[in-house]
Design a protein with these regions (language model features):
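Extracytoplasmic "Venus flytrap"/periplasmic binding protein-like
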Residues: 76-131
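A structural signal for short loop-to-beta-strand junctions that line the ligand-binding cleft
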Residues: 111-167
Length: 184
């Protein structure tokens, strides 16, 4: 019995998708670094040049930080564990309550500008003002993207971050240093 090529297309497509998925897992496994040597920023907005922002932040970190990852929330769908352990977040105001247990109180050094209160203490600092259309890293972050609700965005610190000196088990204060660079 002779098989036609068109009969094999679904199997070939499945093989190609599985191959890409497996190779991406192998690549991530080989190139990833321990959490103590990596700083992660998740942004709940479309990103246009996340690599440029990551390089900009890597330039201000200490030499023991081997990697800065800037990810959109879409990427996090693959690994909810990774997003919950992020060091920094930039999130729209309407989503903050949904992810509220991921955030720590804002360190003193970041308590500048317009602050967002949670449980009686500052948890975020405004990085995008929807009314004025002004904010940080606007050339990289699509705060006012047509697919998003236009709203204020805040920078928040992850409660599981190893890079905030005031946290238990912290190894350094690099998340705060990167946040300060973003806020300039």
């Amino acid at each position: 019995m002779k098989r036609r090529f068109s009969d094999m297309v679904p199997a070939l497509l499945l093989w190609a998708m599985l191959s890409i998925f497996l190779w991406s897992l192998v690549f991530n496994f080989l190139t990833d670094v321990p959490a103590s040597e990596k700083l992660v920023l998740f942004i709940d907005a479309p990103l246009t040049e996340e690599t440029r922002l990551a390089v900009q932040l890597e330039d201000v970190t200490d030499e023991h930080i081997q990697m800065v990852q800037v990810r959109s929330f879409d990427y996090a769908m693959m690994s909810s564990h990774e997003i919950e352990n992020a060091d920094l977040y930039i999130i729209g105001e309407s989503s903050i309550a949904e992810y509220g247990d991921w955030f720590a109180p804002l360190p003193e050094a970041l308590r500048t500008g317009t602050l967002l209160e949670g449980d009686g203490q500052p948890i975020g600092v405004k990085v995008w003002d929807a009314a004025s259309g002004k904010g940080v890293a606007v050339e990289v972050i699509g705060y006012a993207h047509p697919s998003k609700v236009v709203e204020d965005h805040y920078l928040l610190v992850g409660k599981n971050s190893l890079h905030v000196q005031s946290h238990e088990n912290a190894v350094d204060d690099e998340a705060v240093n990167c946040a300060l660079v973003l806020l300039k």
